[in-house]
Amino acid sequence: MKDHKRNIAIFDTFKTRNKKFTGEAVRQRGIIAHLAIEQSPELRTRTSIAHAIAKKHGILWQNIYSGIFRDLDEVLIPSGVVKEGGRLPLRRGPKALQLEGVPFYELTETGLLVASSIEEIGDNRMKMLERYITSIPSVAQSDNIMREGILLLIRMAPSFASKIISEYIYAYSTGLIDKITPLDSKKLQSVISKQIMMERELIEAIIGLQPDQKELVRSFFKVIS
């Protein structure tokens, strides 16, 4: 299902350094996190994004500007995660540039869902996920069950909800699925059914337990976690 678009790299890690994100992954995660949180258009230009990410990592913004430019123009925009939100007028510089203005960026619907899988955003990512899931139309009964189920997990088991969405976004980032939005039950099932077999087995087992057995399981997890 892959096409000519370059896949987003937000989960890419070095093969020789376990779980350490590549420079491209760090930049793209930084761009998405910045656009998810920052409201001012003036602070969502390429230069402002470069400044924000550079400050966080203690480096010069000039050293990552070209990477930011490339990530936006060659990856995040073509993949449908980011779009140009408009242009800001310039009072100085070349006349042509003043007339054209400087672009600022924003997350698309797909981008909001991708952002909910990025830990750097903190608690806001669950709020973003909840906002997106709430907006899903109930066309089919299975989609309604999916929507209400994820909303319940966000409130009661946010870590599990996060795992489900992260696995889904990971499949998108590796090109296993071409589009992640709109989210529907069939598409979600095709990606995560094998990834949550352990949780499903546990939940189905607990449902069938007697009250004293449920209490034992609860105590067991308290002891080992």
Indicate where each model-derived feature is located.
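Short amphipathic alpha-helical interaction segments
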Residues: G23, I59-G86
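Compact, well-ordered interaction domains used in eukaryotic information-processing assemblies
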Residues: Y65-D73, P94, I154-S162
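Short alpha-helical segments that sit at the start of domains
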Residues: M1-R44
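N-terminal pre-domain segments used for targeting or regulation
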Residues: I8-T16, K55, I64-S66, R92
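Short, amphipathic alpha-helical interaction segments positioned at domain boundaries
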Residues: A96-Y132
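Short acidic, hydrophobic short linear motifs in intrinsically disordered regions
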Residues: P41-Q62
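Exposed, interaction-prone assembly regions rather than primary DNA-binding/catalytic cores
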Residues: N124-K222
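Beta-hairpin "wing" of winged helix-turn-helix
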Residues: G80-Q98
